[in-house]
């Protein structure tokens, strides 16, 4: 059996999970997430305050993988509607700063013009000390994608380390020209 897939997902008190055929809906204090699982190899059911993901055929290797994947996605949905997710980014460089304009994010990262990143539905930006950016939301995948879009505006370069990086990310530095 899949080690992750066989574990049940516990449903907290304030969270409601419903399953209709392939559609799983999770409602909680922070919002509502819906995901469709179009996989015939696993079934999802809610029983005794837990979500159980079961394989249709025990011997199928793909079914084991999909069981673990489905369980992890449902667990992330439950976590998102209860606590939410956040990714922190930091800006390194002289004159690099960020401002929040309404819901959107304005970045000044060494270009001749400021770069504006529009917040998608369900995403919230926070700016701390003009050089730290926090991306928050209830959908783990969406938060990660928005953080990657912000980072892609000015990726960290290996010579001086300037750019936008994830908090705690280590940038391998190069030596540069010698002689």
Curated annotation (Swiss-Prot):
GO molecular function, one term: structural constituent of ribosome
Cysteines joined through disulfide linkages: none
Domain of life: Bacteria
Keyword flag Phosphoprotein: no
Keywords: Ribonucleoprotein, Ribosomal protein, RNA-binding, rRNA-binding
A single Gene Ontology CC term: cytosolic large ribosomal subunit
GO annotation terms (biological process): cytoplasmic translation
InterPro entries: Ribosomal_uL6-like, Ribosomal_uL6-like_a/b-dom_sf, Ribosomal_uL6_a/b-dom, Ribosomal_uL6_bac-type, Ribosomal_uL6_CS
Subunit structure: Part of the 50S ribosomal subunit.
Similarity section: Belongs to the universal ribosomal protein uL6 family.
Function recorded in the entry: This protein binds to the 23S rRNA, and is important in its secondary structure. It is located near the subunit interface in the base of the L7/L12 stalk, and near the tRNA binding site of the peptidyltransferase center.
Protein known as: Large ribosomal subunit protein uL6
Gene: rplF
